[in-house]
């Protein structure tokens, strides 16, 4: 492939990576990962509410990795509330999983920025055939994509398996018990998914630029070595 086309492809991949890094930085600080509705089970059972009457006992919340806000309703009007995970909810949430989500998000940002620099270096510089070259680009794209995947899996497990929304809604609520009715992932979560997809796409762009996948290259080299051994 002509060098000019390689420059264009690597520049595109670099721009995609930079956009991903900015997106993840923004997503990390916004309370737009999950939007949930919660039912005040205690109040609904007391008055035997059903149908449209349940709307009086339905609250909602949205939150991210550090803070969030919502409204509790238990038949006596809306009660707005705000919360932060650190230090307010440390005793209520699975801390190890939550910290790992933040940690892998930070690693994803760093690796994506490094990947951006590597793509631009390959576009305009004279890269070595080791980590600065295609091998490094493949490696960074794979690790970054894996980090993005881990962030989504860990956060989804925290929300669905450990019932994060219920724990937040019931935090310091001694009288009423809240039950999650619905949850949906919002903007910030899908930014991580988009970033995961972009790293997969960048791997295809590297291949499109004319560089073999690492495992394909090693397989060809192994075949050559076997042929050389047979000759002797």
Curated annotation (Swiss-Prot):
Keywords associated with the record: Cell membrane, Deafness, Disease variant, Glycoprotein, Hearing, Membrane, Retinitis pigmentosa, Sensory transduction, Transmembrane, Transmembrane helix, Usher syndrome, Vision
Principal cellular location given in the protein's record: membrane
Compartments (UniProt record): Cell membrane
Disulfide bonding pattern of the chain: none
Any Gene Ontology biological process: visual perception
Disease: Usher syndrome 3A: USH is a genetically heterogeneous condition characterized by the association of retinitis pigmentosa with sensorineural deafness. Age at onset and differences in auditory and vestibular function distinguish Usher syndrome type 1 (USH1), Usher syndrome type 2 (USH2) and Usher syndrome type 3 (USH3). USH3 is characterized by postlingual, progressive hearing loss, variable vestibular dysfunction, and onset of retinitis pigmentosa symptoms, including nyctalopia, constriction of the visual fields, and loss of central visual acuity, usually by the second decade of life. Retinitis pigmentosa 61: A retinal dystrophy belonging to the group of pigmentary retinopathies. Retinitis pigmentosa is characterized by retinal pigment deposits visible on fundus examination and primary loss of rod photoreceptor cells followed by secondary loss of cone photoreceptors. Patients typically have night vision blindness and loss of midperipheral visual field. As their condition progresses, they lose their far peripheral visual field and eventually central vision as well.
Name of the featured protein: Clarin-1
Organism encoding this protein: Homo sapiens
């Amino acid at each position: 492939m002509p060098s000019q086309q390689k420059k264009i492809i690597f520049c595109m991949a670099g721009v995609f990576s930079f956009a991903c890094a900015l997106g993840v930085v923004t997503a990390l600080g916004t309370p737009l990962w999950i939007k949930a509705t919660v039912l005040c089970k205690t109040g609904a059972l007391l008055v035997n509410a059903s149908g449209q009457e349940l709307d009086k006992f339905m609250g909602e919340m949205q939150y991210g990795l550090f803070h969030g806000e919502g409204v509790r309703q238990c038949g006596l009007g809306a009660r707005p509330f705000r919360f932060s995970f650190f230090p307010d909810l440390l005793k209520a949430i699975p801390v190890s999983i939550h910290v790992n989500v933040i940690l892998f998000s930070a690693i994803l940002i760093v690796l994506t920025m490094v990947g951006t620099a590597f793509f631009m270096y390959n576009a305009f510089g004279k890269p070595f055939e080791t980590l600065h070259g295609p091998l490094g680009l493949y490696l960074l794209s794979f690790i970054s994509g894996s980090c993005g995947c881990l962030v989504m899996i860990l956060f989804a497990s925290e929300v669905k398996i450990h019932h994060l929304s219920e724990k937040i809604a019931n935090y310091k609520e001694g009288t009423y018990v809240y039950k999650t009715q619905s949850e949906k992932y919002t903007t910030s979560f899908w930014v991580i998914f988009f970033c995961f997809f972009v790293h997969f796409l960048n791997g295809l762009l590297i291949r499109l630029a004319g560089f073999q996948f690492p495992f394909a290259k090693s397989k060809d080299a192994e075949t050559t070595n076997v042929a050389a051994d047979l000759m002797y």
